[in-house]
Amino acid sequence: MARYLGPKLKLSRREGTDLFLKSGVRAIDSKCKLETAPGQHGARKPRLSEYGIQLREKQKVRRIYGVLEKQFRNYYKEAARLKGNTGENLLQLLEVRLDNVVYRMGFGSTRAESRQLVSHKSVMVNGRVVNIPSFKVSANDVVSIREKSRTQARIKAALEVAGQREKPTWVEVDNAKMEGAFKRVPERSDLSADINEQLIVELYSK
């Protein structure tokens, strides 16, 4: 499945919630009718079946993290093999992706921009360039912006925007050095309550 390249607000309207696909600190519902689906008949929301509800939740989480369907299913399979709660394992696997960690540290204004920074070899992990967005970051890893990329205006702008948001407790960032430490894998209580990962588990368990 190809990556979606259309309007970001349309995806958020389809899921009925802010997917944080746009940069900035202002929630997009102030300029976008999230309660109305896109399209001519968007105001007429169909009643979803149990399967439809589960599918929508899966699509929502997949779009938040910018992961393709095949990748997402593979993450679920890995989460199911791990000990503990499968849904929580799934979210943690998505959270330790390098592109997501770059976003959490504030080096990219969106996950899509952070993924681009990684792909363009602007990011280092423990002093080595890593250009794989799905690279799994471990506790105590140091993520930094490559020296020749530190003058990029978009990175400086992203850090300014990130400074207006509450910084995640599981990362520690030195803006001046453009360097951050991934202190630990976030627990479920650290992450958004707007996600119902159990619906995804139920969907894939069928």
Swiss-Prot record:
PROSITE patterns: RIBOSOMAL_S4, S4. Part of the 30S ribosomal subunit. Contacts protein S5. The interaction surface between S4 and S5 is involved in control of translational fidelity. GO terms for cellular component: small ribosomal subunit. Keywords: Ribonucleoprotein, Ribosomal protein, RNA-binding, rRNA-binding. It comes from the Bacteria. It comes from Shewanella frigidimarina (strain NCIMB 400). This is Small ribosomal subunit protein uS4. One of its GO terms (biological process) is translation. One of its GO terms (molecular function) is rRNA binding. InterPro entries: Ribosomal_uS4 (IPR022801), Ribosomal_uS4_bac-type (IPR005709), Ribosomal_uS4_CS (IPR018079), Ribosomal_uS4_N (IPR001912), S4_RNA-bd (IPR002942), S4_RNA-bd_sf (IPR036986). Residues 96-156 form the S4 RNA-binding domain. PANTHER family: 30S 40S RIBOSOMAL PROTEIN, SMALL RIBOSOMAL SUBUNIT PROTEIN US4M. It holds the Pfam family Ribosomal_S4. Belongs to the universal ribosomal protein uS4 family. One of the primary rRNA binding proteins, it binds directly to 16S rRNA where it nucleates assembly of the body of the 30S subunit. With S5 and S12 plays an important role in translational accuracy.
